[in-house]
Regions:
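Extended hydrophobic leader/signal-anchor segments used for secretion and membrane insertion
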Residues: 1-125
């Protein structure tokens, strides 16, 4: 019976992800690179809410202003009164790297949940 618990948990998460993806309110995004370590690792898959307004300390997915065909995953450092955002990495080696200001319209959404790998599944903070 103990083995059933993790299987039921994984099944619940899988169904929840499918329902959310079907609603088109959320999208899934893969983390690529090491700039958001230790919280997010290369290869993590995230559920991103496309309809939430970013706030300071949120982790967001945005179009990279340095390469407009690429998405980036970063933490919101600051939201200006003109809806311009400053983004930053979590990794200490990238501590002095600030991206922006970027328009709020360049933000795809706020990262809500890491669903893969299953062993690291949970809310994104």
């Amino acid at each position: 019976m103990r083995r059933l618990g993790p299987l039921l948990g994984a099944a619940f998460v899988s169904v929840a992800v499918l329902v959310l993806l079907g609603s088109r309110r959320v999208v899934r995004v893969a983390v690529s690179g090491h700039s958001m370590e230790p919280g997010l690792l290369d290869g993590d898959w995230l559920i991103v809410d496309r309809h939430s307004r970013p706030a300071p300390t949120d982790i967001v997915v945005a179009w990279d202003p340095r390469a407009s065909d690429r998405l980036i995953v970063k933490r919101v450092r600051e939201v200006g009164t003109d809806s311009q955002l400053l983004l930053e990495s979590d990794h200490p080696a990238h501590a002095d790297e600030v991206i922006g200001p970027i328009a709020a319209s360049a933000v795809v959404g706020r990262a809500l949940f890491r669903y893969w790998p299953a062993a690291r599944a949970g809310m994104v903070r």
